[in-house]
Amino acid sequence: MMRLLLLPLFLFTLSMACMGQTFQYSRGWTNGKRALTPPSLLSHGHFNRASDLGFSDLYDVQDWSSERRLERCLAQLQRSLLSRVYGSVVDFNANRPEPDSSDSGSSRNRANNNNENVLYPTPIQNRHHSSNELLEEISAAVAGSGPTGAGSGEPSVFGKH
């Protein structure tokens, strides 16, 4: 008879301990340390008994206000970046290669060109090459097909940067 009473009591106690640990962990009260009280709400005399408060509600309010501030800051940053990018559209379009160039690899360069995705337009066109393009340019320069001639041991690619 005693076993029938102790087993449900033990299971209930174990489940309540697990729920309590989960509650404390979700509120940041790990290792017996409670999270710090928010000084802005408690120092102005709005709440007199800090032990009776539901601190999770206070932290939700505090997180919400900081999230709103963060959203406003990110929106301002995004607007400034967009105005910087769209303000220099003339310079940005001047750096693009001409579509009617007679280069044999121009279609490959246009397909791998990252100018459409760049946030900050740069006047240096060679920064947006992929690693395969750079490898091909270096191997072509070493083979002697570069503008420096076949006899030169120095590739012309490194002088551009």
Curated annotation (Swiss-Prot):
Biased composition range(s): Low complexity: 102-117
Propeptide: 70-161
Any one GO BP annotation for this protein: positive regulation of heart contraction
Keyword terms: Amidation, Cleavage on pair of basic residues, Neuropeptide, Pyrrolidone carboxylic acid, Secreted, Signal
Residue positions where Pyrrolidone carboxylic acid is found in the record: Q21
Keyword Secreted found: yes
Chain intervals for the UniProt region annotation (Disordered): 93-125, 142-161
Post-translational modification Asparagine amide, affected residues: N31
One annotated Gene Ontology cellular component of this protein: extracellular region
Annotated signal peptide: 1-20
InterPro entries tied to this protein: Procorazonin
GO molecular function per UniProt: corazonin receptor binding; neuropeptide hormone activity
Family: Belongs to the corazonin family.
Function per UniProt: Cardioactive peptide. Corazonin is probably involved in the physiological regulation of the heart beat. Clock (Clk) and cycle (cyc) proteins negatively regulate Crz transcription in a cell-specific manner.
Designated name of the protein: Pro-corazonin
Taxonomic lineage from the root: Eukaryota, Metazoa, Ecdysozoa, Arthropoda, Hexapoda
